[in-house]
UniProtKB/Swiss-Prot annotation:
Keywords: Calcium, Disulfide bond, Lyase, Metal-binding, Repeat, Secreted, Signal. It is found in: Secreted. Binds 1 Ca(2+) ion per subunit. Involved in maceration and soft-rotting of plant tissue. GO terms for cellular component: extracellular region. Gene3D superfamilies: Single-stranded right-handed beta-helix, Pectin lyase-like. This is Pectate lyase A. It comes from Dickeya chrysanthemi.
Length: 393
């Protein structure tokens, strides 16, 4: 049963009014409950791009009739039907986006697996086991969607049931775990875990002599989206991690947009794109990157990919990459037609690293918000790791 949680004290104390309200809610199949945690009312922190040129409050202004507890996909989509009204949706347990019915082909998966999150919404997991499987959360600005908060949930990356074949590039999957697209803006992602989970890349089969790839991105931000903060989150066991700006020719939509802050996140056993950026301006500080250049499944390739007109300011990050020597430190940043990258105060395998000689021009844009980069130490890296991801809010 989907519960519409009150989350507010009543303005009148009349027992009669309270009894009438509860009776009406029970008659409609919805029972009254309390807002489980005031953390659902929190706005994005002032640190990060989501605080700029406006605010990111999600569903904090929700009235009592737009606060929900949901336990399955039917209840979740019903709660989302409130549209742009402020709403808080509390996730209890596992939401199987497929509803337990396997996808039959590309068209079926496209129709049922992509869940659009409307404006003025907070989605927050309850406890330590809130989870989405077999689908994607989409924040799509086509209809003006903005002001969205996603917190304390685990998302298992979707498995494409019918990948498409591209000559020269092999089999490619379509679906991301999360996608912020088409001009969506003011989005805060916090204490979220995204992982390949129980279907890792070594479980791929082959088809027509080539690897049958069934995972795409973990969290992509593209097509003119803007003012995004990602904090205290974990991306674990994945290849194509985070694409910011989807291609080199989309300057009309992307130029001057795609401002993204990443802080206090952990990227564990991710192969690449943490992130790869075109056109965007990325601030990445006090994040932890863990990998192995000889990992048999998720072989570390690079963290920051600098694409066309993209720029990254990296500060106080920790790179613990097995089988990557200090002499090859520049492998943490890769040039893809881009030229702007700076790093200050980061460490590689426990020692200070100098990335100034990696062939990039300095990042000179002003960061408009006040922030505090903590000196990266082994203890800080462990603290960030211990705090990152779902179930730790």
């Amino acid at each position: 049963m989907m519960n519409k949680a009150s989350g507010r004290s009543f303005t009148r104390s009349s027992k009669y009014l309270l009894a009438t309200l509860i009776a009406g809610m029970m008659a409609s199949g919805v029972s009254a409950a309390e807002l489980v945690s005031d953390k659902a009312l929190e706005s994005a922190p002032t640190v990060g791009w989501a605080s700029q040129n406006g605010f990111t409050t999600g569903g904090a202004a929700a009235t009592s009739d737009n606060i929900y507890i949901v336990t399955n996909i039917s209840e979740f989509t019903s709660a989302l039907s409130a549209g742009a009204e402020a709403k808080i949706i509390q996730i209890k347990g596992t939401i199987d986006i497929s509803g337990g019915t396997p996808y039959t082909d590309f068209a079926d998966q496209k129709a049922r697996s992509q869940i659009n999150i409307p404006a003025n919404t907070t989605v927050i997991g309850l406890g330590t086991d809130a989870k989405f499987i077999n689908g994607s959360l989409i924040i799509d600005g086509t209809d003006g969607t903005n002001n969205v908060i996603i917190r304390n949930v685990y998302i298992q990356t979707p498995i494409d049931v019918e990948p498409h074949y591209e000559k020269g590039d092999g089999w490619n999957a379509e679906w991301d775990a999360m996608n912020i697209t088409n001009g969506a803006h003011h989005v805060w992602i916090d204490h979220v875990t995204i992982s390949d989970g129980n279907f890792t890349d070594d479980m791929y089969t082959t088809k027509d002599g080539e690897t049958y790839v069934q995972h795409d991105g973990a969290l992509d931000i593209k097509r003119g989206s803007d003012y995004v903060t990602i904090s205290n989150s974990l991306i674990d066991q994945h290849d194509k991690t985070m694409l910011i700006g989807h291609n080199d020719t989309n300057s009309a939509q992307d130029k001057g947009k795609l401002h993204v802050t990443l802080f206090n996140n952990v990227f564990n056993r991710v192969t690449e794109r943490a992130p790869r950026v075109r056109y965007g301006s990325i601030h990445s500080f006090n994040n932890v990157f863990k990998g192995d250049a000889k990992d048999p499944v998720y072989r570390y390739q690079y963290s920051f990919g600098i694409g066309t007109s993209g720029s990254v300011l990296s500060e106080g990050n920790s790179f613990t990459i097995a089988n990557l020597s200090a002499s090859k430190a520049c492998k943490v940043v890769k040039k893809f037609n881009g030229s702007i990258f700076s790093d200050n105060g980061s460490v590689l395998n426990g020692s200070a690293v100098d990335l100034s000689g990696c062939g990039f021009s300095a990042y000179t844009s002003k960061i408009p918000y006040i922030y505090d980069v903590q000196p990266m130490t082994t203890e800080l890296a462990q603290s960030i790791t211990d705090n990152a991801g779902s179930g730790k809010l």
